[in-house]
Amino acid sequence: MLFHFFLRCNLASLCIKIVNSVVVVGLYYGLLTTFSIGPSYFFLLRAQVMEEGTEKKVSATTGFITGQLIMFISIYYAPLHRALARPHTITVLALPYLFVYFIFYTDKRFMHPRKNAMLNTTTSMRNFSIQCVFLNNLIFQLFNHFILPSSMVARLVNIYMFRCNNKMLFVTSSFVGWLIGHILFWKWLGLVLVWIRQNRSIRIRPNKYIPFYKLIRLDKYLVSKWGDRIFYILVILIWFYLGGKIPAPLLSMKFDESTIQLEKGAKGKKKKRGKGEEEGDVEKEDEVGVGEKKGEIDESEEIRVNGELFKSLVAHFFVFDPNHFATLLFDPNRWNRPFRYIKNDRFDNAFRTEMSQYFFDTCPSAGKERISFTYPPSLSTFWEMIERRISLPTLDKFSSNELSNHWVYTNEQKSNNLKNEFVNRIEALDKESVSLNRLETTSRLCNDNTTKEYLPEPYDPFLNGPYRRTIKKTKSLSPEKTSGDNLETSRDNLETSRDNLETSRDNLETSRDNLETSRDNLIDKIGINRIHSILLPDIPDTDYQKLEDQFDKKQLSIEIVDLFTFAFISEFGKKKGPKSESNLISRDLLISRDLSVFSDEKEVRIEDGKGVIIDDEKGKKYFEYLENRIGTNTDDENIDKDSIAKIRKKVSRWIYNATSELDQAYGEDERKDPMDNEIRSRDAKRVIVVPKEKLERDDDDDEEEPTDIDKIIFPEHGDFRRDVIWGSIRAQRRKIVIWRTLQRYTHSPLFLDSLKDFRHYFVDFLLDILNIFEPIWRIIRNLRIFLIKLIRKRFALKILEHREEQQTHREEKKKRKKDEKNEKNAKNAEDPEREPRLWVSEFWTIIEYAQEVRGCVLLTHSFIRRNIVIPLLIIVKNIGRMLLFQRPELYEDFEDWQRESHVKCTYEGIPLSETDFPEDWLVEGIQIKILYPFRLKPWHVPGSDSDQNRKKAEEKGDFCFLTVYGTETNLPFGYSRLPPPTFESFFKPIFQELKKQMRNSKKNIWKLGKMLFQKVKGTKFLRKVAKKWVRKSIILGKKIIEGLKKIKELVKKERDPITSNQMIPESFTQISSPSSTNSEKKRNKMQDLTNRANKARNEIERIRKEKKKKKRSLKKTSSNAKRLQRIKDRLIRKLPVYLKLFIQRIYTGIFFSIINIRRMSQKFRNKFIPDQERKDILPFIYTINKIKESLYTNNSEENSHIFYDLSYLSQAYVFYKLSEIQLSNLDKFKSVLQYQGIPFFLRSEIKDSFKTQGIVHSKRLPSSEMNQWKNWLRGHSQYDLSKTRWSILIPQRWRNRVHRMVKRKNFNKRNLYEKYEKDQFIDSKKENICEVSNRNQKDDNFQKCCKYDLLSYKSIHSENKKDSRSLFDKLSFNSNTAFFDLLVDRARGMPIDINNLTGTGDIPYTEKTPDRKYLDWKMIHFDFIRNQLDIENWITIDVNRKDNRNQKTPIYTNNYLTNDHDTNFEIIYKIDKKTKKPILDLDFLRIPEKNPSNSSKGFLDWMGLNETQTHPVVLNKFNRLKMEANLFPEIVLFYNAYKTQPWLLSSKLLLLNLNNNENEINADNEKNEKKEAKKEAKKEAKKEAKKEEKQNIKKELTTKGDLENKGDLESVPSKEKNPSKDSKEKKDIQKDSAESTTKKVTSKELQKELDAFLQRYSGYLVKWNRRVDPDIVPKSEINWEVYSYLYRLFDDENPRNRKEIDPTHLVLSSAKRGELAFEILATRPIQSWKKLLLKRKELVFFEPIRLFGKNNGQFIMYQTIGISLVHNNKHEIQPRFRKKKKRYGSKTNFDESIPPHERITRNDERIPTNDEDEKRNKRLRINYERNADKNHLDLLVPENIFSFRRRRKLRILNCLNSKNRNDVDRNPVFCNEKNSSQDLDREKNLLMKLKFFLWPNYRLEDLACMNRYWFDTNNGSRFSMLRIRLYPRLKIR
C-alpha cells in the first residue's frame, strides 16, 4: 500500500512537472497560434485549391512553414526581432510588396504564357512561377495576423518567453506545436470537404444552384478568371486595411511653426533656434548687445520667409531629424499631435499630458543597479556630460558586489549616526540643559572652520527650520560697466512693466520679454549651474591647473555660494544715480544684513559708477576667477546653448497654443484663417434670441434698444469627439463590446476580473436589455423595478451609513422630477410633439454623415414633387375629366401649381429664400418649407379661387415642411399629415358629392313609391286586389318555411346511423334469465358490431357509386360541353385579333370624344340659352357676315390697294411661314465665312452654293434669331394647322409674294429727307391712286388685318435692319407735298394699315386689337370720365410757331365742349370743290419745315414736340365723333391725337421738372399771378358753391351708374407749364369753333350731361353700316334729350311706351335732324332695341367693348408715354439739322440721378378745377418758354421709374440680348450701293452712346403685344417686365 501511495505521488508530481515544462508550454502556445489567421492563409488556400500541379502546392506549403519558422526564430534572435517583430517595420515592408504583387499579377503582359516562356525552365525548382509562390507564402507569413481573432494570440509566445529560462527550447516546442496544429487544421478542412461531397442531402438541397454549378464545371476558364479576380480584390482590401493602420504624414494637418532668425548687432553672428526635440520646447531669445550706453536693443527678429523652398515644404509636413530617422515615420505623438489637449488660460503654452518629467534610466538602488522610472532627464544629461568631460576613477563602473558592499556600509554608517545622535539627546536631557536648541541640531554652511562664520539663516541651504525660505531670482554681476548698465535698464524695464501689468496686456508681454532677455544675458555671462564652466568642452587644461593651484577643492562649493551671494548683493545694491538716497539706504541695509559671510576685517566698498571694489584678498581671487572663467567671452562663444537648454529642463509644454472651434467662432482666436482651429468642440448650435421688447418697440422710441441674446445650444446626447485634437489617432478598441450610443465604463469582457467593482457592468447590461422591450414595458415594469432594488440592496456600498443622506437626496430628486414633469406637461400641452421632434433632430445629429444624406434626400424629394409628381397628377386628373366629357382645368391647376414655392430654411426652420442655401447646410442640416402647397381638386368652383380666398389662406399660414419620406408635416421633424392632403382634397369633395346624390336618390325613390301608393290608393278595386295578393303571399311564405323545416329534420335522421338502425325495444318482462346483466352486455356489444359493419358497408357502396359516376363522366361528354370547348378554342385562336380591334375601337372612340368635347360643351351651353335670345343672335350674326362678304366682293371687284408688305400678315400666318422655312444652322456658316484663313474665291463659291440651295435669299447670312423662333414655333402644336385653315387667314395672292422683297431700283434712304420734287418713290402713272375716296367710295377702303403682332415683325425683320418702304410703292403725292408714314417703325420696318387712321376700316376686332404705333391701350385702364381737366392735363399744344402757314389753323384741346377750347383731332378732311364733301387730307402727315436759325431749343425739340400742324378744314363735331368711335370710344380723342402726332404732347409734361431750378420757376409764376389776382378774387366765391354741387353730382352718378370703379382720380401734376398763346390766335380759334358748330350749349351744363350719360350708358360700341346712305349722318349738335327719351322708351319697365310710339320713326327722324349720334350712344341689353335696328334695314349694329376700371389716369398715362415715346427724328429732323444737335444731354448732369421720390414727378400739386384751367395753362406756357432755350434736359430713362431690383434685371437682359449691329444684312432690293447716310440714331457722340447703352428706351407696345400673344389675354393683369424680350431703342455702331 505504501508503495502504491508513493507511486501515485510520483506520478502526480511527474505530471505536474511535465505540464509545467517548457516543452509542453511551448506546444500549448504553438497550438494557440494556429488560430491566429493572417493574410498568408489566402495565398496558401489559393495554391491548394486553384493551382494545378503538386509543385506549386508543395512550394506554397514550404514557404508558409518557413515564414512561420522565421517568426519564431525572431523571438529569440534580437536582429530579426528588431526587423520583423515591430509593427511599423512590418507595415513598411508589407505595403510596398502588396502593391507590387497586385500590379504584377493583374497586368496581362506579365501573366501571358508566351511572355513568361523565357522565365520558365525545364526543371521545376527553377520555374519562376513556383519561386513566386514560395516567396509570397514566405513573406506574407511575416505580416500581422489580424483576421481571426487578432495578433494578440500570436504575441502570447513573445510574452511568455520572458518568463522561461530555456528560451531556445521554448521556441522550438512552440514551433512544433504550431506545425502540429496547422497539419490538424488542414486535415480537418479536407475531411469537411469530403463529407460535403459524400453527403447527398447537402448537395441535393440547393437545387436552384445546380444549373450554375453545371455551368461552372463546363467552363473551366470562367472558374479561373473569377477566382483570380476575387483573390486580387482580397489582396487590395488587405493593402487598404494595413495602410489604414498608420496615419498619412502628408495628409495630416500640422501646426504652424516658424523658424526665427536672430541677428546680433555687434559682431553680426547669427544664432538659430529651430524646432525643439521630442519635448518640443521652442524659446525666442532676445539678446542685448554690448557696447550701447543708452541700453538700446540692437538685435532684430526676422521670420524666415525667403528661405529655401524645399526645406520649408519638408518642414511643413515633416519633423525631420537626421539622427533619428525612425521618428520621422513612427512618432510617439502619431505624426503631429496628441489625443487630448489641456488648455492653459495663461500666456504660456499648454502642458503636454503624454510627456512626464521622469523617465526610465539606470541608477544604483539598494546596492544594485536598477531601472528607475523616477529619474529626471536633467540629471541624466548632466551625468552624461560629467562622464564625457571628467575622467575620474570614481566614474568607473562597479561590479554588483562592490555596489552592494558600498550600500551596506553607508547604511550601517547612517544607522550609527542616528544612534549617536539619539544618545546625545538623551544625555542632554539627563543633564537638564537650559538650551532647548540642542534638540534641533542642524548643519549649517560655514565660511571658515576657524572663525566659524555662517551664512544668514534665510540663505543657508542646509538649514531646515523656520528660517528657511526661497531665494528670489537674482541677476548676476557683470564685471564690465556696459553690461551692468544693461542689467540696470532691464531691471528698470521689469519694474515699470510690473506697475503697468493691470492697465494693459501689451505692457505685460513686453516686460516679460525684457525679463527673458535679461535672464538670457545672465546665462551668457555666468551660466545656470555654478560649476558650469568646469563641464564645458572648450575649457583648456591650463585653466584646471590654475584652478587647482588657487583654490582648495573642499571649499569650492562654499566659496562659489559665497560669491553668488555677493554678486546678488552687489547687483541689487547698485546705485542708479548719484542723488538717489533711497537706493543708498537699501544698499546699506543689504550690506549690513547680508555680508555677514566675511569677517570684520573685510572691507567692502561700493563706489558710484565703478561697480564693486573688494579689498580682501580672497574676494579679489573670487572676482578674478569669475572674470576670467565664468564670465562671458564674446569673442570665442564658449557657452554651448544646446547643453544649457538640456540642463535647464522645465515642464514640457506644447510649442503651440491650440484653439477650439468655439473660441474661433467668438473671436477669441486672433488668427484670420477660419479653418485654422485645432481642437474639436462639442456639437453646438448658435441661436440668436430676439427679446419681445425689441419686436414690440416702435422706431420712434428714444429708449435704448434691447440687445439680442447670443445663445449656444448643446444637444442632450454625449459627444465623444469634444476636446479631441484634429487629426489625432484614436484608440482602436476592437475588443470592446458596444451596444448603445452612450456607454459608461467601456471595457473588454476579457478584463472584467481585473476590475474592482464590475457589478455596474451587468447592471447596465440588464437595463439595456430591459429597454429593448419597450412595447411590453408595462408588463415587465414591476419586474424591472424589483431587479433594480435587489441589485442596489445587494451590491451598494455603505447604504446603512448614508441612509439619511440618501433619503434627503431622494426627496430632492422627487421634487426635481415633479418639477421637470410639470414643465414637460406644460410644454407638451403647448406642443405635444415637442419631445419626439427633439429626439428625431438629435438622432440626425448623432449619426455620422447623416445631415449630408438627409439634405440630399430632401432636395431630391423637393425636385420630384415640384417637377414630376404634381404635373403628373394634374395631367391624369384632366385626362379623366376629358374621358368623362367634362371641361379640362389645366390652366387653373397649373396656376395653383405655380403658387407653390419651396423655401430653404435652416435646421431650426428659419426661412431664407427659394434659391439661397444656408451656410454649411451639409454639416448643420437643412429644412425645406413649402409655401401654399398644391392641393389637387376634382373641380374648381368659380368663387373659390378669388383673391379674397387666397388672402384668407395667406392669413391662415398655409405652409408645411418636407420630410425625408416625401410627406408633409406641420413642424420640422413632426408627424406626417395623415391622410395625405392631396388625396384628401381630391377624394373628399367627390365622396361628399356622392353622399348628396345618394341622399337625393333615396329621397326620389321614396317620393316615387309614395306617388305610386297614392295613385293606387285612389282606386278601390286595385286596393282590394292588392290586399288579397298580400295575404296570399304571406300564407304561402309560411307554408314554404314549414315544409323546409320538415325536410331538414328528415335529412338529419337519415344521416344519423344510430337513430336510423335502432332496434325495436322489447319489454323486460318477456325475457327473463338469471344472468340478465351478462346478456345485456353481450347484446350491446353485438349491437355495436353490427352498427359498425353496416356503416362500413354503406361507406364502401357510396365510394363505389362515386367511382362509377366519375368513369362515366370521363367516357361520355355531353354535347354542350363539346360545344363550349370548341367556342373556347376558337376564342383563344382569335383573341389577338379581337384585342387589336378592341384597342383600335377604344382609341378611336376616345379620340373622337376628345375632338367633340368642344362641340358638346357648346351644345350644353346652348341648352341654357333661351330660345328668344338665340333667335335674336342669329340675324345679328347673319348681318355681320353679310357685310363682310360684301366688303370682300367690293374689294375684289374694284381694284383695291393691297399692300404686299409684311406688316399686313397675321401673326399666326407669320409663324406658320416661319415653321415651313427649312431649318439650317447658319451660325457655323457664319464662322466659316468670317474665318480669315479661307481664300476669297472660296467664300464667294460658298455663298453661291447657299443661294442655289435656297438657304439664303441675300448676300448676307440671316441672323440666328429666326432659327430660334423657328425651333420654338415647331414645338408648339397650335400653329400646326391645316391648309384650309391657313387659306382662310390670308388671301392666296398675298402668300405667293411673301418670300420676295419688293424690288425697287435706285432706292436711297436719303431721298426721304431731301426735296420732295426729287422723290423717287412717286410713280407718275399712278398719281391718282393715292387719293383717298370720299363717302361715296367707302367700299374701296383698304383691306384690314387686325390679328398681327409686333412679335411677328421681330421674327421676320430680324434680317432687315433697314427701313422698309413698300408702302410708298402704292402711293403717290403731289410735287408740293411730302408723305411720311408715321406708323412705320424705321428701326424694324413695321408699317400699319392706313385704315387705322381714317376710321373707315372694317369692324374692330376686340379680342386682339390691331397693333398700334406707340401703345396698346388695352393694358391700361383709364377712367371713363372725359373731364376737361384730365384731357387737357394730358395733351397740350404749342402754338408759338413762327413758321405757320398762310392758312388760319384752328387748334383745339381734347374736349367735348363747344367753348373756346374746342377739340383737335388727327383725322382732318378737306372739302372737295366738286362734290363739296369731306375727303381725307394727307397733308397732316407732312413733315413741317423749320428754319435752321430757330433750332436752338431743348433736347426734346428735335423729337417734334411742342409744335402745331396746319389743317385746312376741321369737320364738325358729329363727323369727328363718328370717325373716332370706330376705334376706342373711351379714349379715342387722346389716342388718335397721340398716335399720329406725338409732338402735340408737351415735353415738359412728359419729363416734368428734371433739372430746372424751382426757385426760378416760382419767381416767374409770381409775376403772372399778380396780373391775374384780381380776376381770381372775383371767381373765388363762385368756386366754393360749385364744388359742392359737383361733389353731389359725382356721388349720384357713381352710385347709379353701371360702372362703379374704385380707381384713384388723383393725377400727377407737374410744374412744367405750357407755352402761352397769342391773343390773335385765340380769336381765330373762337371764330373757327363758332363756324363748325350749329348749336351752342353752355359748357357747364353740357359737361354735366356728358359725364352722366357716358358713365351711365357707355357699354356698347355702335357702328353704322357702310351701305347706308351718307345723308343720314347728321351734321348738327347732339340732342341729349332725344337720348334720354330713347332710353326711357326702350326700358323694360315701361312697356306702354313701346306700344304707343313707333321707335323706328323716332330714331330715323332724330338722326336726320342731327340730334342723334349712334357712335356715342350705348344701349342696354334690350331686345326691342336690337329688333328696331336690325329688323329691316340693318342700319346699325352693336359691339361690346371692354369696360375699364377707374384707375389713376394721369399717372398711368404719364408712365406709358414716358416709356413708350419714341424719338421722332424720322418725322421731324432733316439731315441738315443734325450737325447742330450733337449733344442731347449735358456732361455736367450726366451722372445726376433722379431720387426715388422724384422718379415720376417732383411736384405734388393738387388737381386744378375747371375754372383754374386758364391760370394753369399760362404757368405751363411760361415755364416751357423758359426751359425751351436750355439744352440740359436729361434723357427719359425707364430705370428712373423702375425699382432698384428691376433696374438690375433690365440691364442684364439688355446686355444678354444685345447683338452686334455691324453685320446688318444688305439686300439689293433696297440699295445697290453702300448708304453713307448717318441718322440721328448713329450719332458719333460717345456720351450719347454711353447713355443709350446704359439706359435703352423700350417700347411699351412691344411688351403689350408680347403679353397678348404669350398669355392670350387682352388685359394687363399678367404683364411682367421679366418675361419679355426687350428691344434697344437706338442702334449703336
From Swiss-Prot:
GO cellular component terms, A-Z = chloroplast inner membrane
Which residues fall in a compositionally biased region of kind Polar residues?
476-487, 1066-1078
Q: Where is the composition biased (Basic residues)?
A: 1105-1115
Segments crossing the lipid bilayer:
18-38, 60-80, 87-107, 128-148, 176-196, 230-250, 1135-1155
Is Repressor set as a keyword in this record?
Answer: no
Specify whether Membrane is a keyword of the entry.
Answer: yes
UniProt lists compositionally biased (Basic and acidic residues) regions at 488-514, 819-832, 1564-1642
Which region ranges are annotated with the description Disordered?
Answer: 266-291, 473-514, 808-832, 1066-1121, 1562-1642
Q: Which UniProt keywords apply?
A: Chloroplast, Membrane, Plastid, Plastid inner membrane, Protein transport, Transmembrane, Transmembrane helix, Transport
Q: Which biological process terms from the Gene Ontology are attached to this UniProt entry? A: protein transport
Look up and give the membrane topology term. Multi-pass membrane protein
Q: Where in the cell is it found?
A: Plastid, Chloroplast inner membrane
Compositionally biased residues, Acidic residues: 278-289
The record's family statement is: Belongs to the TIC214 family.
Recorded hits in PANTHER family, A to Z, give: PROTEIN TIC 214, PROTEIN TIC 214-RELATED
Q: How does it assemble?
A: Part of the Tic complex.
* Purpose of the protein: Involved in protein precursor import into chloroplasts. May be part of an intermediate translocation complex acting as a protein-conducting channel at the inner envelope.
Under what name is this protein listed? Protein TIC 214
Q: Which gene encodes it?
A: TIC214
